[in-house]
UniProtKB/Swiss-Prot annotation:
Residues 30-270 form the ABC transporter domain. Belongs to the ABC transporter superfamily. Lipoprotein translocase (TC 3.A.1.125) family. This is Lipoprotein-releasing system ATP-binding protein LolD. Its main location: membrane. It comes from the Bacteria. CDD domains: ABC_MJ0796_LolCDE_FtsE (cd03255). It comes from Salinibacter ruber (strain DSM 13855 / M31).
């Protein structure tokens, strides 16, 4: 297989601190209690995006969080994935309080235990599809040669086995998102967070990707949390919650949702 010159013999050597999590059988994979997220806007009062939010996600569950743009879906996923810290409240992963950990420990935790898929894929343009998929393992100071079989396996699983040597500029929008999903699964994470993963695709391109996400959730041992304004994506979930006024409300079925147009939020006060 041809490898891009940018990653010939590439290996990351920066050591990461171990992040060992005890996991009782009856403990939710994710437990969120009284979560508060505010931002300083320079005015008299902070901007409150999430308030008094509680959530439990069981191992193996597929949860959809829906809501209009600007309601804080992306902000919530950033907190669940330890990309940001809350103003108050706790997020426990397998019983362990994430935000009692140092930034270095959280970085190690994220790379090992969380897979992220965002609306905009952020693939590295100078790398091939395979090299982009392998990136989470390379960050864990594994060599490209060692992780190539796993990356090939994931690309094949998503119907991209003939695109391994292609760079992002030669891929369609749907193919790029499949590469992003494969990358999120590279380290076999316990939790996969998907923030508007089909939000920038048209309906014709998005529908097959919805089916792929549903199939992956059935066939692979992962927990999925999907955030979307798109009700058709939420249909793959076993449980649907609406984020409104900074907190979560249950929905009886995905068909209770009205389609909403709009992109993901910017991490401060949106989607």
């Amino acid at each position: 297989m041809h490898r891009g010159a940018a990653t010939q013999g590439l290996v990351f050597t920066t050591p990461l601190s171990p992040f060992i999590l005890p996991f009782a059988v009856d403990t939710p994979l994710l437990q969120v209690d009284a979560l508060l997220k505010q931002y300083d806007t320079g005015g008299d009062e902070p901007l409150t995006v999430l308030r008094d939010l509680d959530l439990a996600v069981q191992e193996g569950e597929i949860l959809a969080i829906v809501g209009e743009s600007g309601t804080g879906k992306s902000t919530l996923l950033h907190l669940l994935g330890a990309l940001d810290r809350p103003t108050d409240g706790t997020v426990r992963f397998a019983g362990t309080d994430l935000f009692a950990k140092s930034d270095e420990e959280l970085a190690a935790f994220r790379n090992r235990s969380i897979g992220f898929v965002f609306q905009f894929h952020h693939l590295l343009p100078e790398f091939t599809a395979l090299e982009n998929v392998a990136m989470p393992a390379l960050i864990q100071h594994r060599s490209l040669a060692d992780v190539t079989p796993r990356a090939h396996e994931l690309l094949a699983l998503l119907g991209l086995d003939d695109r391994a040597d292609h760079r992002p500029r030669t891929l369609s929008g749907g193919e790029k998102q499949r590469v992003a999903i494969a990358r999120a699964l590279m380290n076999e994470p316990a939790l996969v967070l998907m923030d508007e993963p089909t939000g920038n695709l048209d309906a014709r391109t998005a529908e097959p990707l919805h089916r792929e996400i549903e199939r992956l959730s059935r066939e692979m041992d992962h927990t999925f949390v999907l955030a979307s304004h798109d009700p058709s994506l939420a249909e793959v979930a076993g449980r649907v919650l609406r984020l409104e006024h900074g907190t979560l409300h249950p929905l009886a079925a995905a068909d209770e949702m009205a389609p909403e147009a709009g992109p993901s939020d910017d991490g401060h006060a949106g989607g």
